[in-house]
Amino acid sequence: MSWEDDVEELKRRMELAAGMGGAENVERQHKAGRLTVRERIDRLLDHSSFHETGALAGAAQYDGERLVAIRPANFVMGTGRIDGRRVVVGGDDFTVRGGANDASIGGKQGYSERIARELRLPLIRLVDGTGGGGSVKTYEITGRTYVPGNPAWDIVVAAMSEIPVVAAALGPVAGLGAARVACSHFSVMVRGISQVFVAGPPVVERAFGTPIEKEALGGSDIQVRAGGVEIGRAHV
């Protein structure tokens, strides 16, 4: 019995997943002055040291019995090395539904936190998502809505007393993403590209009746003064 066909099929599926949210969304990410999550991980880690976990987690599309497309989960994680030291790294994929919760595989993000604690390895979060709440798309998929929660938050908090935790806000970050940036020992933003807030300008305007720009609400200058991040003026 040969496994050659199965191995080739697995490789094909990995290639589909590596396409992230598709060429159009990748191009949009680049035009916004931002790298994709895979490009970020590739530049961060030592060459060829990244060992990905859960690459095929996501939503599959079939034509009969043949897989024709994969929408991967919008979170990429694994282990790698920085200057020879082993670390755990996890990053949001903004090219898949803007990092929204309806395209996530919840256990995948939580696993990155758990494995870092279990292996006693530094944890690096590359945050570029819209949070952990629901959306209209969530309602379309599940037929219901829900009150956002994070049952794994105890793991996030526990990590602060056990391992080094670093976070980088690499785009507009709201909700749970903002909490993940704040709950770290060292955090950084990209000036003019990153904003960190609990809720974005449309929600704030609806609540207070006053329009506000995202830089004024949660830009790097605001967050450095408020103590939300340690370094908010990095340039790319």
Q: Language-model features: where?
A:
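Long, structured ligand/cofactor-binding scaffold of large enzymes
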Residues: L35, R40-V166
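Conserved catalytic cores of soluble enzyme domains
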Residues: V127-R233
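Short glycine-/small-residue-rich flexible loop motifs, especially phosphate/cofactor-binding loops
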Residues: V26-E27, M77, E113, A178, ...
